[in-house]
UniProtKB/Swiss-Prot annotation:
It catalyses: a 2-demethylmenaquinol + S-adenosyl-L-methionine = a menaquinol + S-adenosyl-L-homocysteine + H(+). This is Demethylmenaquinone methyltransferase. The gene is menG. Belongs to the class I-like SAM-binding methyltransferase superfamily. MenG/UbiE family. Gene3D superfamilies: Vaccinia Virus protein VP39. Its EC number is 2.1.1.163.
Length: 236
C-alpha cells in the first residue's frame, strides 16, 4: 500500500527522534543555530508575548521563544510526533520553563481559537506538511491582527554552480550521513526529497501573500540554502 505524505513524514520523525538534533548539526554544519538566532532578532519578540511554535519537534525554537517572552509570557509548541515531543519535554524541564508547554497535534488543523497568539513560528517543518497553503492559512488564523508569522526553512540557492553542488549534497551525501550517524538512510533520504520539491523563496513569499500576510520579509542564509519568511497579519 502506498503511504501518504503525512504517513511517511510521521514514520520518519517517529524513527529518527533520538538522533534528530545531532543530525541537524551535521547536515547544516552547525549553521541552523545561527540562522535561528538571526531570525529571532528580526522577529523582535517582546517580553510577555504569547507565542506558538508549529511543528516544534524537539523544541529548540520553542525554548528560544520561551527565553524571549520571559516568565510573564507564554509559549506553546505543537507537533504530530509524540517521540519528538518526548525529547522536547525533557529540554523544557531542563530549562525550568513553566511558561512553556508542548502539545500533540496537527499543523493542518491548529487546535486554537482565532487570533490567539502574538507570534507564530514554524522551523524546518513546513516542507513536511501535506498542504503548505493550508498550514499558512491556519497560522494566519490563529495569530492576532498585527502579529507575525515566521517560517525558517531549507531553500534552494540561485547561483548556478553553488546550486548544483547543493543538490548533489542533498541527493548523495546527506542520506549517507543519515546512515552513518543516525542509522537511517531511508529516513534521511526523505529530507532531500522534501527539500527538492519545496517552493523556492520567491514562490513561498507569494504564498505568504496569498494566505493573507502583509509586509512579507525574506532573508536567505548561507547562499540560499535556508531562508526566513516573515509576514504580518493586517489590522483590518
Amino acid at each position: 500500500m502506498t503511504q501518504t505524505k503525512e504517513e511517511r513524514v510521521h514514520q520518519v520523525f517517529e524513527s529518527i527522534y533520538k538522533r534528530y538534533d545531532m543530525m541537524n548539526s551535521v547536515i547544516s554544519f552547525q549553521r541552523h543555530k545561527a540562522w535561528r538566532k538571526d531570525t529571532m532578532k528580526r522577529m523582535k519578540v517582546q517580553p510577555g508575548d504569547h507565542a506558538l511554535d508549529v511543528c516544534c519537534g524537539t523544541a529548540d525554537w520553542t525554548i528560544a521563544l520561551g527565553e524571549a517572552v520571559g516568565h510573564n509570557g507564554k509559549v506553546e509548541g505543537l507537533d504530530f510526533s509524540k517521540n519528538m515531543l518526548l525529547i522536547g519535554e525533557e529540554k523544557v524541564k531542563e530549562h525550568k520553563m513553566k511558561h512553556v508547554s508542548l502539545r500533540h497535534g496537527n499543523a493542518m488543523e491548529l487546535p486554537y481559537a482565532d487570533e490567539t497568539f502574538d507570534v507564530v513560528t514554524i522551523g524546518f517543518g513546513l516542507r513536511n506538511v501535506p498542504d503548505y497553503m493550508q498550514v499558512l492559512k491556519e497560522m494566519h488564523r490563529v495569530v492576532k491582527k498585527g502579529g507575525k508569522v515566521v517560517c525558517l526553512e531549507t531553500s534552494q540557492p540561485t547561483i548556478p554552480v553553488f546550486k548544483n553542488l547543493y543538490f548533489f549534497y542533498f541527493r548523495r551525501v546527506m542520506p549517507v550521513f543519515g546512515k552513518v550517524f543516525a542509522k537511517s538512510y531511508d529516513e534521511y533520504s526523505w529530507l532531500q526529497e522534501s527539500t527538492m520539491s519545496f517552493p523556492n523563496r520567491e514562490k513561498l513569499a507569494e504564498m505568504f501573500r496569498e494566505a493573507g500576510f502583509e509586509r512579507v520579509d525574506v532573508k536567505p542564509y548561507s547562499g540560499g540554502v535556508a531562508c526566513m519568511h516573515l509576514g504580518v497579519k493586517g489590522k483590518n
